[in-house]
Structure formats: structure tokens, C-alpha cells
């Protein structure tokens, strides 16, 4: 039919009251009895319900959509059906109105299939979009910033952690070094003695004319030697004349072998023993007012090579000798009362000390000196060793538990023994920070000269002391976090330049190289010189060129970095989080949990204690935990992520010999001639330069590759492509849900009121 017939039927809607009464009767009748209602579809007979909306007349549209037809008067189920039909005709989503307005079943079926197909495609593409979003992909943006980069903090350490002259006064260190000497002696076997035999075999067979047999004692080798004062039985005066004659013959033979004789000088390390053996007792004796109660000269050197295994019988044969545990040498020896306890200018790694040294600087070391001015480091706190007791029992006189704790048993490789000895030096953790700082190098002793940006540094103010468990006292330049230092230009002249002095003559026997250790880090980060440091040798100018890269990482869910700050178990308080610090914290927590004490190399939380380095049980537990973690970085027990913000310094190292022969100037506090100071600093000093190679730095910034905005754009595109749905269309569905929920609640509330009224009515009728 034409739309005019529809308008004719529409006239029935002009009077709503009459229409509702005519079609539905009483609106509330459905609550009282089952009444068959005439639906809109039946009313319009053969006309499609949607055809009424095809009229282009604005008045008709107004009446149909907004006007006088009230769906609230319909029964609940009919009202819902009417509401859904209204939504189908009015929604802006594609396909749904075509299904609702379909003139027949076939037409509707085609549109249903098309709609379902589009929904399937929408699902597949939407799933792909969501998967891409859930992958949390990120991109790295690299920018080159042409700006002055902040200068890093520089931590400087001496490769020798503690002064041998002072550290050997600590009983535990002394015992550790003694065990180390014993292990080195066993590992080396009789190599030195075999070498002497080879020399004798290759020597000319024609003996020199002599009136008595020659008993040549080989020259003592300083490598590995370590002197300490010890009591021994000796032969003095006429008792030791035969040995003295042998010694004179030995010195006479050496005179034929050596044309030039030099006194001992710490500036000439290769000849230091020559000077020690060439002293002349008569030239160095001083007039001590000592009464010779036994008829002998108490200032005279005594002999103990034949008697050192025997216990002294009295005052006349009780001497103090310079004893070396590794070679069992006891020489020189003088009567007990002739040694003088005093202070020496320098003491080297062999505990041999000298007085009145022109190149010496800093504090003096306690020592004990013989009348010949042969001096040995000695603090006087522990009595000298009894040599006869030591030699009769050998190294086993040491506590077996202590030897086991040191871990030298069964070791035959000298390099491994030295490494183990370095590890054992964490025994110093039993001392307070103040004591460890006192035993180590001071900043004034290590840093002689310093400049930054071409201007002199204030060594006391610009360097902060930091006690490291491996390197002792270290000193950090640019430690003030409130001051931002920058280089005004690139190149070594505008960076940090330091003249350092290591005093190699006072090195520990466990220190293998002379020089300094340099660590470059952010001032907020804890320095780890044993892991990230660079070594700079003496006798060279070491140039470290820097390039800075700043990393900015995304936290979860895009990345796996740790936000600014530190984790709860981080043991390096007042410092920012780092991966190395995390691993060490994890290891320390594991040790504290299973060993009931902490590794002495790392800090412990408040209330915890460090393990005793001499306790074999604690050492076994520490070694077991180390093996469990595969070193310090066992990933299966410790999970440490990168920090979200990090500064990475790339270092380029280049050395050159230093000082040059033309550098004829007084360096540091050297009081000798320019040539002597030049040679002295070549063995004990170094020049260190740290600078930026370019005044720019890289910024590496992570950002999300596919964010929420991208998700909305792609998802909205898929909705529009396959279903023609926009954000407003989604709002239509939301309102549809809210309206149907409201109608359901309203209907249930009406039923509730009806039941309540019926119940009240029954109660009222029952009371009459």
C-alpha cells in the first residue's frame, strides 16, 4: 500500500485515550487477568511496522517518535519488545536497522548473515589490535645533546690497601701473612735452593787459594721476604769468631765480584738488598754506654746460624735477630739489650725500615733498630717470636683451625695463593673504620697535586674518604651532590689531573702491582673499584677519555627496571640503586640467613655482624654460599634489574711514559736533586688524567611503541569499517542497557507493591 494508507491508519493515533481504550482496554487489566492484547503489528495489519517511519512529512515523524504514544502503558514484555524495536529503527549502527526493517524473512536472513560476518571480522581484527597492545612494545629514541655534560665522581685508590709497616702490627694480619708465607714456601718447594745448586755446579772448579774451607752463604733474595724481630740463641765475641771469619771471607769474595758498592736506597728497588749486606759494622757503630758484663762488646754483631734451633741459656746468648719465616734466615743478630725501639721514616713491603730518608714523607712508623742501624718494623704490642720454638715445630705451630680458615691447604699455584691471600685480607673488617683508615694511605699521601678545569684543587675539601674492603682508603673527587661540576672544554687540560704517589716501599706482600685504581661513576652511585675500576701504573701518565650516555628506561609493564631509589634489602644506604649493589645485597642477605653472619667485604644491616675471618666454620659457609651463587652474580637466586635512570660512562684509556727526562723539576715533596726525584717518581708516582673527549652526550630514551591512544584509534577504525560503529553508537548501546535495566527494576517494584497490597488485604479481611 501507499504511504497515504499508512497515514489513514495513523489517524487512529490522533486521539490517544480513545485508541488506548479501544485497543488495550484498561491499562492495568493485565495485572488482574490474562487479557489478549492487540499488538501494534496486528493493528497495522499488512503494513510493516517500520514503514510508518518512511514518511518524509515532519509532522508524521514528530508524532511517531516524540508525540503522544506512551509505551509505559504497555505490558512489561510488550514494552521491552517495543523498546528493542525502537532501538533497531533508530540506532546509528550499520546493519541493525536493515534487519529490523526487513520486509520478509529472506531479506532479514541475508542481513543477519552479513552482520554476523562483519562481527567475526571485527572480532579477529580487534583481537589482533589487543594482542599488539598487550605486547607492551617500546622504542628507543637516541638524541645527541650538544651541551656540557656533568662531570662524574672519580674514586681513587692505592692498589696497596694498607701500609705494610702498620698493618703488620695487627695480630690477625700478621698471622695471615705468616700463613701466606708458609703457603708460598710450600708451593715454591726448593726452587731457590735448586737454583743455588745450579750456580755452584756451573762455577769454575778451580778453587781460590785459601787457608780454610770456604762456606759461602748465598745472598738472600728479597722476593717474598718479610722480616720480624725474633729471639734466638746466638754466639757473640770469641764464641762467634769462627762464623765471623766465614762471613768476612764471604764479604771478601763479594768484593771481587762487585766493583761498585752502593748503600741501600729505596729509590733503587733492584739493588736494595746489595745495600743491606754491604754495611760495615765498624762504620755504623755508635758509642753506646753499655757495660759489657760478660767480657764482650755488646755492640758487636752475633752469629746464630748454628744455634738458632737451640733455646738461649741466659742473657749472654739471648739475641734479637731479623727473622724471615719463609727462608728461616735469622740475621743480623745482636744482644737483646742493644736494640732500640724508635720510629723510622719509611718501611717497605719486607718490613725493612730506614731512618733519615730524604724522600720520605708523611707519618713515621714504629720500628726496632740494631746498633748497625739495621731496622725492622715492630710496634712493640706483641713480643718477638721465639725462633727456636718456631723452627722446631715449623708452620704447624699455628692454630690448625686458623690455617684451615685461610684456605691455603693443598694450593700449589703461587698466583692462586696470592689471590686467596688478598681475599683473606678482609680480616681487616674486624677493625673499626677509624683503625682501617689509620692503617691505610691518607689523601695527602696519595694525592700530591690536583687540578680541575686548569685550576688547583683543594685536596682536603674536594676529596671524600671512602673505606673500601679491598683497597683500603679511597678518595672520591666531586662527591658533593649539591654542586654540579662541568668541564668548560674537552681535553685533558680541562678535566681532572692528579699527581699521585703510592710509596711502593711500604707495599704489602700480597700486592702484586704498583699503581692506583680509578673508578668513574655517578656521585649518587656507590663506587665498586674491585669490579668497575681501571688500574693506572706508576711511571706513566694514564689518560682516561670519557663519553657519557644517559639511559631512561620504562618501568613495568613495558620494561623490567627498578624505579628511582633502591630496594628494601639494599645494603648500601644513602646511595642509589645499581645492579652490582643489588647482587651484593642479595648475596649478603643469603649469607646472613644461612651463616648467621655477614661477608666482611660488604656492609651488614643494623643489628647484624660480620663473620670472623679466622673461623673455619664461617669461612666454609661463605665459600659454600659463593659456590651456590656461581660467584657474586648467581641469577637463579638473585634477580636484579637495571635502574630506570642510569648514566653510563664509556672510557678510552691511553698511557705514556712519565716523567720525561726533560722534566727536571722538584715534584711533590721530594727533597733530592731533580734527577733523583725524577727516578723516584717513576717508581712511586703516576699522573692520572680524566676528561671528556667531546662536549656532548647521548640520550637514550625508551617510549611506548603502541599506547592506549593507538589502541583506541585502531579499534575505532575496525568498528567503523566492519559495523559502522562510533563512540556515539556505543553510547546508544549503553543507554539501551540502562533503560532496560530501569524498566526491569520498575516492573519488579510494581509486582512487589501488588503482593504487599494483597497480603495487607488478606490480613485485613481475616481480622473481621
From Swiss-Prot:
Is Zinc-finger among this UniProt entry's keywords? Answer: no
| GO MF term set | ligand-gated sodium channel activity
Q: Where is this region: Disordered?
A: 187-221, 237-260
> Quaternary structure per UniProt?
The channel is probably composed of at least the mec-2, mec-4, mec-6 and mec-10 subunits.
Positions bearing carbohydrate: 336, 357, 480, 484, 503, 671
What are the entry keywords? Glycoprotein, Ion channel, Ion transport, Membrane, Neurodegeneration, Sodium, Sodium channel, Sodium transport, Transmembrane, Transmembrane helix, Transport
> What's the protein name?
Degenerin mec-4
Q: Which PROSITE patterns match?
A: ASC
Q: Which species does the entry assign this protein to? A: Caenorhabditis briggsae
Q: Biased-composition ranges for Basic and acidic residues?
A: 189-200
Amino acid at each position: 500500500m501507499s504511504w497515504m494508507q499508512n497515514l489513514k491508519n495513523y489517524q487512529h493515533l490522533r486521539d490517544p485515550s480513545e485508541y488506548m481504550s479501544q485497543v488495550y482496554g484498561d491499562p492495568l487489566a493485565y495485572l488482574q487477568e490474562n487479557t489478549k492484547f492487540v499488538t501494534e503489528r496486528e493493528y497495522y495489519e499488512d503494513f510493516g511496522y517500520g514503514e510508518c517511519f518512511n514518511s518524509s512529512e515532519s509532522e508524521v515523524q514528530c508524532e511517531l517518535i516524540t508525540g503522544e504514544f506512551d509505551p509505559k502503558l504497555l505490558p512489561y514484555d510488550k514494552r521491552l519488545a517495543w523498546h528493542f524495536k525502537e532501538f533497531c529503527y533508530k540506532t546509528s549502527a550499520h546493519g541493525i536497522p536493515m534487519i529490523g526493517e526487513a520486509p520478509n524473512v529472506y531479506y532479514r536472513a541475508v542481513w543477519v548473515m552479513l552482520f554476523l560476518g562483519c562481527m567475526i571480522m571485527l572480532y579477529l581484527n580487534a583481537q589482533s589490535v589487543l594482542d599488539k597492545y598487550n605486547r607492551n612494545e617500546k622504542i628507543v629514541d637516541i638524541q645527541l645533546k650538544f651541551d656540557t655534560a656533568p662531570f662524574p665522581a672519580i674514586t681513587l685508590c692505592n692498589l696497596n690497601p694498607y701500609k705494610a709497616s702498620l698493618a703488620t702490627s695487627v695480630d690477625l694480619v700478621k698471622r695471615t701473612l705468616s700463613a701466606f708465607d708458609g703457603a708460598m714456601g710450600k708451593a715454591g718447594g726448593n726452587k731457590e735452593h735448586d737454583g743455588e745448586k745450579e750456580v755452584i755446579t756451573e762455577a769454575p772448579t778451580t778453587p781460590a787459594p785459601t787457608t780454610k774451607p770456604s762456606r759461602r752463604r748465598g745472598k738472600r733474595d728479597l722476593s717474598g721476604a718479610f722480616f720480624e724481630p725474633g729471639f734466638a740463641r746466638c754466639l757473640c765475641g770469641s764464641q762467634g769468631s769462627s762464623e765471623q771469619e766465614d762471613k768476612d771471607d764471604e764479604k771478601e769474595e763479594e768484593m771481587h765480584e762487585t766493583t761498585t758498592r752502593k748503600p741501600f736506597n729505596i729509590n733503587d728497588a733492584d739493588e736494595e738488598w746489595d745495600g743491606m749486606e754491604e754495611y760495615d759494622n765498624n762504620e755504623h757503630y755508635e758509642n753506646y754506654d753499655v757495660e759489657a758484663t760478660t767480657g764482650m762488646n755488646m755492640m758487636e754483631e752475633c752469629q746464630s746460624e748454628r744455634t738458632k734451633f737451640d733455646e738461649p741459656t741466659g742473657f749472654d746468648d739471648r739475641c734479637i735477630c731479623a727473622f724471615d719465616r719463609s727462608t728461616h734466615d735469622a740475621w743480623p743478630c745482636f744482644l737483646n739489650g742493644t736494640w732500640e725501639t724508635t720510629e723510622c721514616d719509611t718501611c717497605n713491603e719486607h718490613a725493612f725500615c730506614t731512618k733519615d730518608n730524604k724522600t720520605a714523607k708523611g707519618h713515621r712508623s714504629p720500628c726496632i733498630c740494631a746498633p748497625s742501624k739495621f731496622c725492622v718494623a715492630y710496634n712493640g704490642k706483641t713480643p718477638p717470636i721465639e725462633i727456636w720454638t718456631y723452627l722446631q715445630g715449623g708452620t704447624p705451630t699455628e692454630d690448625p683451625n686458623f690455617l684451615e680458615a685461610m684456605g691455603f691447604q693443598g694450593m700449589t699455584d703461587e698466583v692462586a695463593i696470592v689471590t686467596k691471600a688478598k681475599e683473606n685480607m678482609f680480616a681487616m673488617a674486624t677493625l673499626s673504620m677509624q683503625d682501617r683508615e689509620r692503617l691505610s694511605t691518607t689523601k695527602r699521601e696519595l694525592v700530591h697535586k690536583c687540578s680541575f678545569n686548569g685550576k688547583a684543587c683543594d685536596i682536603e675539601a674536594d676529596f671524600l674518604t671512602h673505606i673500601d674492603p679491598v683497597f683500603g682508603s679511597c678518595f672520591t673527587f666531586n662527591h658533593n651532590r649539591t654542586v654540579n661540576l662541568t668541564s668548560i672544554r674537552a681535553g685533558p687540560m680541562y678535566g681532572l689531573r692528579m699527581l699521585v704517589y703510592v710509596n711502593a716501599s711500604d707495599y704489602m706482600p700480597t700486592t702484586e702491582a704498583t699503581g692506583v685504581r680509578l673508578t668513574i661513576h655517578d656521585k649518587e652511585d656507590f663506587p665498586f673499584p674491585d669490579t668497575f675500576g681501571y688500574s693506572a701504573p706508576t711511571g706513566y701518565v694514564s689518560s682516561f677519555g670519557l663519553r657519557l650516555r644517559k639511559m631512561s628506561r620504562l618501568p613495568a609493564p613495558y620494561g623490567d627496571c627498578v624505579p628511582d631509589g633502591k630496594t628494601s634489602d639494599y645494603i648500601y644506604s644513602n646511595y642509589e640503586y645499581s645492579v652490582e649493589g643489588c647482587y651484593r645485597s642479595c648475596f649478603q642477605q643469603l649469607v646472613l640467613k644461612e651463616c648467621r653472619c655477614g661477608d666482611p667485604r660488604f656492609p651488614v644491616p643494623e643489628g647484624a655482624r660480620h663473620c670472623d675471618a679466622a673461623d673455619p666454620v664461617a669461612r666454609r659457609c661463605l665459600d659454600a654460599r659463593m659456590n651456590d651463587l656461581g660467584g657474586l652474580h648467581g641469577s637463579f637466586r638473585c634477580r636484579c634489574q637495571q635502574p630506570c635512570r642510569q648514566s653510563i660512562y664509556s672510557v678510552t684509556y691511553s698511557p705514556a711514559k712519565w716523567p720525561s727526562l726533560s722534566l727536571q723539576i722538584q715534584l711533590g715533596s721530594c727533597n733530592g736533586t731533580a734527577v733523583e726525584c725524577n727516578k723516584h717518581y717513576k717508581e712511586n708516582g703516576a699522573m692520572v688524567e680524566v676528561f671528556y673527549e667531546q662536549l656532548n652526550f647521548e640520550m637514550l630514551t625508551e617510549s611506548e611503541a603502541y599506547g592506549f591512544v593507538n589502541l583506541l584509534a585502531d579499534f575505532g577504525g575496525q568498528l567503523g569499517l566492519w559495523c559502522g560503529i562510533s563512540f556515539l553508537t556505543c553510547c546508544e548501546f549503553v543507554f539501551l542497557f540502562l533503560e532496560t535495566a530501569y524498566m526491569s527494576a520498575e516492573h519488579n517494584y510494581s509486582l512487589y507493591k501488588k503482593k504487599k497490597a494483597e497480603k495487607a488485604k488478606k490480613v485485613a479481611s481475616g481480622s473481621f
